[in-house]
Amino acid sequence: MQISYIGMQTQEVVIKPILKVLLKSDSQNLEEVVVTAMGIKRSEKSLGYAVSSVKGDEITKARESNVLNSLSGKIAGLQIAQSSGTVGGSSSIQIRGASSIGTVSSPLFIIDGLPIDNGSYNPDRTNGIVDVGNRAGDINSDDIESINVLKGAAATALYGARAKDGAIVITTKKGKKNSPVFVTVNSSTRFENVLKLPDFQNEYAQGSYGVYNVKMLNGWGPKISSVQDQQFTDYKGDKVTLKANPDNVKDFYETGMSYINNVSVAGGGEKADFRLSFTSTNQTGVVPGSDYNKYAFSVNAGMNFTSNFTGRISAQYIRSDSEGRPAQGANDSNLLIPLINGLPRTIDIHDIKQNWMDENGKQVTLDPEGKSNNPYWIINKNKFTNNLDRMIGNIMLTYKPIEGLTITNNAGTDFYTEGRRKVYAKGTVGALNGKFQTWNLYKRIINNDLMATYEKTFANDYHFKVMVGHNIYQEEWKNENVQAQNLVVDELYTYTNAKSTTPVNYSEKKRLVGVYGDISLAYKDMLFVNVTGRNDWSSTLPINNRSYFYPSISGSFIFTELMKNKDILNYGKIRLSYANVGSDEDPYNLAFKYTPASTYFLQYLGSVNTFPHMGLVGFTGPRVLPNENLKPQNQSSFEVGADLRFFGGKIRLDMTYYSNITKNQIVSIDVPLSTGYFANNINAGKIANKGVEVTLGLTPVETRNFKWDLDATFASNKQTVEELAEGLDEYTLTSGLSGLQVKAAKGDSFGLYGTAWKRDDQGNYVINSKTGLRETVNNVRLGDVYPDFTMGINNTFTYKGVTFSFLIDIRQGGSLYSETIANLRSSGLAAETLAHREDASFIEPGVILQADGTYKPNDVPVKSMQDYWQHTANSSNNEGNIYNASFVKLREVQLSYSFPRKWFKSFFVKSLDLGFEARNLWIIKDHVPHIDPEANFFGPSQIGGGVEFNSIPSTRSFGFNLRLTL
């Protein structure tokens, strides 16, 4: 007798009075459906391009407050960079490398067919940046059914200009028709601590050249053990004996807590289904006084009004708030990390925690002269706050007037308002009179897609499907910013309490209208061809150039359908695609744009003043010369790949090669100041991204009770800047980082440029004959921004009801500049600065250039190791702070037990799972001292990478999870 079931392997058994049969999953016979562009559902075998999918269960294995972090290491070609260890912090995402010079290369996010915002607005690029997260972090992971990553232009062409850098298509969970009501509870409690702390020396006090100086926050003073019989003045003015406090930095950080709780109710009747969900995320950070709270309510409901007319609504409301998120970067009075890492080894962290303010309410600074803020003054007095309200929702109506014809309209909106406030209490070093700044942000996206689809099968062998559609997309952005200075009453942060206020308001609007079409042909379920085309009209481009068309063609061939013997190779597909897409630019770059000014400079008086002036507000003209002849950016994409399945699916191999060429970049080039402008927008530049992606799945062992699955991903992308503007060999993407610049240089990938050590032909350091220190040379390429390759290896072991899995995340290549390490070394606090301190004749290995042009071995000792490190690790000597950013990490661990359902037969409980979960647990190998090599100063809205600038240290988390279905 044969026993079969959909999606399971058929088994033949001998007939007995009592049979117990366990059917195994049959991944070969189960038709996998993938959600692609415009929400079109296609069979996986029909796709002529690479699509990677992650199920919702994979995302919630070890939940993160930002869902993007859960994708790290799981998808080939997808690179995630977490910006900091701040609670609710942001993460940038990139697919197949950076393709643009003038704009951020970030994929489009889609939820249930609606494009949503993933911005991360930050008014400053380097000064006092507070990481407030990116908008994709608002998405609740418990509501996600699946995430499909569309990588190539052929996969995303129907979305138009917005998806030139790929698309992340999210499908949310729904109820089921004719299903009883289920209540599901998912609760996690996590503990969080700093992943990696600096290695400090604990032998020397603060000072200079071995002499104690309480005014200095460093480690260049006397050896502590040699002055035990002496007393010195501390930061409070008390006489003390010097003593090392090895854990003063470690003890500053707290154990963060994270509570993520979700309750959902789902079910359905004969004509309707529904799912309601509520999630609360409550976090306290490792930085004292920092917290993040997010509350998300979602609904997804569908209704069959008639046999041929249906409707579905999907909506999410998110409310989040935070307090005490610390500032990062430079040049800001509220910076914490330089203060904490810069603590002299003699300072007791518990002492300054108890003595940050005197009885008169005045700050007790870290030095008697009041030049360094007490970190606990910043934590208690200068709290950054923000709150956000966001609504994402769409309504989809579907009508089927005749057999084979489907008409769908999907209308939706994504809008949010956010308020931020940064404060500096009176008495703060750098802002003694007190000040504050507020932002009121508003973003709204409106999108409507009307589509008509017709499909028909001919002669049983041919299947034809055609779709035409129309899209209207509009987004609005507003920013109301007020700077208030010189407070009358301390800690009263109202505009009327400030002697000077400077309002700066800005708004912009953009509209895109498009028409598109899609034709699919299939023959005998083994040969598939898909052709798409889209034409967009953009409001941000000149009238003559605002219309642009981009086509795509893709195909797949299931060659194993022609094979008789499939014992070894069960399934084989070859796929091929080509696409050409265009994109526009930001609004208001075609004409003269005047923006509000907050300050003005009186040349002859040499003073800076603020607006309003004598009751009049000020405006300034554009810095960039408008260009009315701009054309759309253009990208051509070619992709070829194969999907193979061996031995009944026990070996699964997907391979892809791609080549993306992006030209007509819209960039700003410098122009003579005599023109009255700083730059001019032009079409120029050509960037190539070529690479390979491999996904390998193995099931090495599978028995009745035990199964081992191994899934590995590999991706390598080579970026090359093939062309820039005429006469231009390099273009600065980002600067203002202690002389370091991120540049696009002709013939290279995006790289780090700055001051390097001068070398002879053999690579030896050239040493200054007077100081014994290395000589420097400017504007040298110091390293690549992006890695050579990335890998992820995920192992899952299942034994009866026990599941154990762990994910290894690998990055090879790329460089990292660290300002944190520069500060640690130049201040004499890093452990490695102990070497040769007592050696008065340390000679740096290298050569000295002689008068006749020849070199001789260096024989000049440095004056002291203080001079050596303050030169070698000086932030302006960039090469001294560049490191190999490669790493191997234990990214994720999960252990869970599913209690047998038979235990609950007489109860209302349908299922119960208990588990242990951990994220970012261990840096197995890296080449960067003191900090996490994954540290990234650039957020999702910035171009560049490979830079760490006084960032909040990253964290590891571990805890417990309970899942219950009633």
Predicted segments with their positions:
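Short, small/polar-rich motifs associated with maturation and membrane association
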Residues: 1-298, 304-306, 310-312, 316-318, ...
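Conserved small-residue
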Residues: 184-239, 589-590, 603, 682, ...
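Extracytoplasmic gating/loop element in the C-terminal half of outer-membrane beta-barrel translocons
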Residues: 234-238, 249, 538, 813-913, ...
